[in-house]
Amino acid sequence: MDRVNSSGHVISVSPSLTNSTGVPTPAPKAIIAAALFMSFIVGTISNGLYLWMLKFKMQRTVNTLLFFHLILSYFISTLILPFMATSFLQDNHWAFGSVLCKVFNSTLSVSMFASVFFLSAISVDRYHLTLHPVWSQQHRTPRWASRIALRIWILATILSIPYLVFRETHDDHKGRIKCQNNYIVGTNWESSEHQTLGQWIHAACFGRRFLLGFLLPFLVIVFCYKRVATKMKDKGLFKSSKPFKVMLTAVVSFFVCWMPYHVHSGLVLTKSQPLPSQLTLGLAVVTISFNTVVSPILYLFTGENFEVFKKSILALFKSTFSDSSATERTQTLNSETEI
């Protein structure tokens, strides 16, 4: 019996996603590889520019710090895309060794968890800034934001340890080396007991990833922005809702882009039919690539009207990511809040 394995991340294609010869069909393979290469080129340039502007050309504030780390998580993901694309072009053959198999997938997992955690942190920060302005003025500092960022990276790294443990390479006896998760605990892969245990471990890893990397952050973000929107409406502050629009754009783009990935992971877990799995895999790769490349651009253009685009790029960055509008709302709310 074959070992219990899964693509785990979209870096490899499950055996169920191939045609009768065991090789991914040419059209989806070419589309996926092209999307990954284009995302690498555009994402490296755009995210690199964002990081440079936020780090060296803007004032160090809570907002710029959180956005810097969010975009850093996107930038890390883009650096792995060429290796994924090469694997797809070589019929899912992994030519970079077992160490990089573990490292790249673990790094991709870290960036995934970090990005959703930073989106959650930004929404919670916006919640406190709008609904608890006095507390925010007393505690909301760049040093506080730096500590939050450090904890997020540590937590994302801890949650990604399973990819260092279970990810490995193996020969599929068809001339290809696969980089996949092996959830079998032990060397006796024929044992039904080990097969059952492996299936339970696979299910536990999927549940942990879906719960902590998607569902719970989604509920936190929805709650925070619902309360923020209600408060802003009550106080008539929607004219100053630029940061709110930026955050909402980030949230929508992230969850729309990551939903196909979690759907695909669920189909792999349940050993669904090949066609739905293949479609969701291709969609997941394209949407995740879209998320790492386009989301930062969306923040920029939803953060200010088109007239500001006629100004310098630096002015546009400052207008989008600065705390000025948030501070104005805080001062307005603070004047109406009883201490």
Swiss-Prot record:
Where in the cell?
Cell membrane
The glycosylation sites annotated in the UniProt record are 5, 19
Q: Which GO terms describe its cellular component?
A: plasma membrane
Q: Which UniProt keywords apply?
A: Cell membrane, Disulfide bond, G-protein coupled receptor, Glycoprotein, Membrane, Receptor, Transducer, Transmembrane, Transmembrane helix
Give ranges for the Extracellular compartment.
1-30, 87-103, 166-209, 269-283
Q: Where are the transmembrane segments?
A: 31-53, 65-86, 104-124, 144-165, 210-230, 247-268, 284-303
The record's listing under Gene3D superfamilies reads: Rhodopsin 7-helix transmembrane proteins
* Spans within the Cytoplasmic topological domain: 54-64, 125-143, 231-246, 304-339
Q: Which pairs of Cys residues are joined through disulfide bonds in the record?
A: 101-179
Q: Which domain of life is it from?
A: Eukaryota
| Pfam families on file | 7tm_1
- The main place the protein resides is membrane
Provide a Gene Ontology MF annotation, just one.
Answer: complement receptor activity
Gene Ontology biological process terms in this record:
inflammatory response; phospholipase C-activating G protein-coupled receptor signaling pathway; positive regulation of cytosolic calcium ion concentration
Membrane topology designation: Multi-pass membrane protein
Entry's family note: Belongs to the G-protein coupled receptor 1 family.
Protein role: Orphan receptor; could be a chemoattractant receptor.
Protein's UniProt name: Probable G-protein coupled receptor 33
Source organism of the structure:
Rattus rattus (Black rat)
Its lineage reads: Eukaryota, Metazoa, Chordata, Craniata, Vertebrata
